[in-house]
From Swiss-Prot:
Keywords: 4Fe-4S, Iron, Iron-sulfur, Isoprene biosynthesis, Metal-binding, Oxidoreductase. It comes from Bradyrhizobium diazoefficiens (strain JCM 10833 / BCRC 13528 / IAM 13628 / NBRC 14792 / USDA 110). Pfam families: GcpE. It catalyses: (2E)-4-hydroxy-3-methylbut-2-enyl diphosphate + oxidized [flavodoxin] + H2O + 2 H(+) = 2-C-methyl-D-erythritol 2,4-cyclic diphosphate + reduced [flavodoxin]. Pathway: Isoprenoid biosynthesis; isopentenyl diphosphate biosynthesis via DXP pathway; isopentenyl diphosphate from 1-deoxy-D-xylulose 5-phosphate: step 5/6. [4Fe-4S] cluster binds at C310, C313, C356, E363. The lineage of its organism: Bacteria, Pseudomonadati, Pseudomonadota, Alphaproteobacteria, Hyphomicrobiales. One of its GO terms (molecular function) is iron ion binding. HAMAP family: IspG. Its EC number is 1.17.7.3. This is 4-hydroxy-3-methylbut-2-en-1-yl diphosphate synthase (flavodoxin). Transmembrane segments: none annotated. The gene is ispG. Belongs to the IspG family.
């Protein structure tokens, strides 16, 4: 397997080649096997609340989530799943639903066949699918139902609910070794073995490799990196990346981006989920936006036009450029669901909103369309650049509205029918 230092080339900047994995179809979404890296999310509603869950899945799907996981933890939740699927279909939403099962998944799937049929994938936790002599039987029951319905599974080991029998066995072997390993290293090995042994058992039960996805989630960044490097080096199953319990706000974003960014750069990962703890009253769709932004800033995919803006300094005492950057970014995200169809390729657009003369003109020239707002002590004029050339200069109190109108006009003429960028003499 390629190490990070082997991905650096003095002439060619970019990630390592993607780790070869077996492609899995989850509904109509391809995962692995060279397919684009998929962004997924999870609801935090009570799944038995049909209307509430439909509303949140719809919001996540509109935000760009390509698969959505829902908790199926009791009979009321299992009974609700087909109604949720039907309700989404009535809204024109076909985003695959993934059932998250713990402890009693085998019972729920058997007792509610309509739930088993409505879900696009089942998530199994090998650490709590069953205990002692019941583990193998209950795991086999879920695989049998998955096979019957031709559904893929994600076998997801988790640091917080690791198979204790396997962990104890490995700890005992390590204690008896002449060269014992660090306890965390043994725990990481247990994570990898738990996922791989369960996948091998699923194949023995008739589950084809192209219906198996693996994950091994921990909450510590360095452990996560090591676990997934090991998992990728020992298998070619499709891989789901995620940092469990990443945390709230900037801490969660930084932790997930640090861990997943390194793994993605090394070619590891076929689908990602950013597990953010929402702020009180916060928007659940934030995790989707962060996942998209991570993949887009690393150059793996494009989802929405990028808005580049300077961080501000003593030259930019005015907040005008900050307000304009936020206004443009919010406007673009709000319009993207409609623009995806109306303006094919618009996600490739780059917009620059800069705050002064130092870097403003240069950065604006590198964007498809950019504006350099006046800094402190500068003339109250804002040059606009289109595809590297000065297009016109905006002045007065309506600079923000005028630039927004130019962006809309550029998008319409560049990506709409006719696809011709307006070029006029600079004013």
């Amino acid at each position: 397997m390629n190490k990070l230092e082997n991905t650096i080339d003095s002439d060619i900047a970019g990630p390592a080649p993607r780790h070869r994995t077996t492609q899995v179809k989850v509904g109509d979404v391809a995962v692995g096997g060279g397919a684009p890296i998929v962004v997924q999310s999870m609801t935090n509603t009570d799944t038995a609340d049909i209307d509430g869950t439909i509303a949140q899945v719809a919001a996540l799907a509109r935000a760009g989530s390509e698969m959505v996981r829902i908790t199926v933890d009791r009979e009321e939740a299992a009974a609700a799943v087909p109604h949720i699927r039907d309700g989404l279909a009535k809204r024109g939403i076909t985003t695959p639903l993934i059932g998250d099962f713990h402890y009693i998944g085998h019972k729920l799937l058997a007792a509610y066949p309509a739930c088993a049929e409505a879900l696009a994938k089942y998530r199994i936790n090998p650490g709590n699918v069953g205990f002692k002599d019941k583990r193998d039987t209950q795991f086999a029951d879920i695989i049998e139902i998955a096979n019957k319905n031709s559904k893929p599974v994600r076998i997801g080991a988790n640091w917080g609910s690791l198979d204790q029998e396997l962990l104890t066995k490995l700890m005992d072997e390590n204690a008896a070794s002449a060269n014992p390993r660090d306890v965390r290293a043994v725990t990481r090995e247990a994570m990898v073995q738990s996922a791989l042994l369960s996948a091998a058992r699923a194949e023995e039960l008739g589950m084809p490799k192209d219906r198996i996805i693996l994950s091994a989630k921990v909450s510590a960044v360095q452990d996560l990196i090591a676990v997934y490097q090991d998992l990728a080096s020992r298998s070619d199953y499709a891989i789901h990346l995620g940092l469990t319990e990443a945390g709230m706000g900037s801490k969660g974003i930084v932790a997930s981006s640090a861990a997943l960014g390194i793994l993605l750069q090394q070619g590891i990962g076929d689908t990602i989920r950013i597990s953010l703890t929402p702020e009180p009253g916060g928007d659940r769709t934030r995790e989707v936006q962060v996942g998209q932004e991570l993949l887009q800033t690393m150059g793996f995919r494009t989802f929405v036009p990028l808005v580049a803006a300077c961080p501000g300094c003593g030259r930019t005492t005015s907040t005008t450029f900050q307000e304009l950057a936020r206004s443009i970014q919010d406007f673009i995200r709000d319009e993207m669901p409609a623009w995806k169809t109306k303006y094919p390729g618009v996600e490739e657009l780059n917009v620059a909103v800069m705050g002064c003369i130092v870097n403003g003109p240069g950065e604006s020239k590198h964007a498809n369309i950019g504006i350099s707002l006046p800094g402190t002590g500068e003339a109250p004029a804002a040059p606009v650049f289109v595809d590297g050339k000065k297009f016109r200069t905006l002045r007065g109190p309506t600079i923000s509205d005028d630039f927004k109108a130019l962006v809309i006009d550029y998008i319409d003429q560049r990506y709409g029918q006719g696809a011709k960028v307006p070029v006029t003499a600079a004013e």
